[in-house]
Amino acid sequence: MTVLPEKEYIYEDEITKEPEENRRLKRLKRIMGYGKRRRAKETTTVSDMFIYGAKKLLAEGKISKEEIGAIVVVTMSPDYFCPTVSAIIQGELGLDFDVQCLDISQACAGYIVGLVQSFMLLEHMEGKKVLLFTGDTFCRVSSEKEEPPSYSAPFGGDAANITIVENAGNEKIYYEFHQDGSQRNCLVIPDGAFRNPMTVEQIQHQVTRMPITSVVMDGSTVFNFAQKEVPVLINSLTDMAEISKEDIDWFLFHQPNKFMLQKLAERIK
């Protein structure tokens, strides 16, 4: 199930810059395929969307409280540092105290990371299911004021997804992850946690490099990493599963950049 905020923003309606900036943003639309996005109210958190969707699943009989053995939450925009979002959901749904609650801080790879963690939990919970929650209120950490601009604001949107994960026979699961922590500054929210904490004065006067908790992205480095590593991952995974790329009907990539997807498609042919 996917939960979307009601408010929809059309990309063209957000282009209100001076003429030169207007031309740049229109070029971005053509190259990257920007169209529209959803944005949650300032008072709406990711747990609000998760809980709304979970209650709907329960009301529709898609799953019962007794079947839930674990809650896995993947988000970069939690309600608080503490408690965890999964604990908030457990409490709001009135689930048993022995339901396992796990929060994972992941961005683009988050759904797959959460899915694999859910598979692992199922190995130790006979007869139970896992509720996997993935989502963000990303608009709050997107900024058009970054120097250099990262373009995170045009494609940053808010949404939540809930997946019911359960065992189904003895089918094999194939997966592989590549991480490069040495490039951690290429996609980072630099301020607000304990490395660069905010003082009371900074919070009151917004004396920061940019709006508090904004994302900084080195787009070219992210692009190059994806173009280099993703084809390697695909080849490794198909070899592991002993299938060919021609056997696969659809390749689904977590990426809002049309240009990057087109270039990636050329490399994996």
Put a short name on every predicted segment.
Residues 26-31, 35-47, 76-129, 135, ...:
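Conserved catalytic cysteine-centered active-site region
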Residues 53-69, 232-249:
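Phosphate/pyrophosphate-binding loops at sites that engage ATP/ADP/AMP, CoA/4′-phosphopantetheine
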Residues 74-81, 248-264:
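Glycine-rich phosphate-binding loops at beta-strand->alpha-helix junctions
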Residues 123-159:
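Flexible, glycine-rich active-site loops centered on histidine and acidic residues
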Residues 1-43, 146-224, 232:
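Condensing-enzyme catalytic core mediating Claisen C-C bond formation in acyl metabolism
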Residues 218-222, 226-235, 241, 249-255, ...:
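Internal helical hairpin/lid segments
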Residues 8-9, 82-84, 116, 141-146:
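Short acidic, glycine/serine/threonine-rich loops at helix termini
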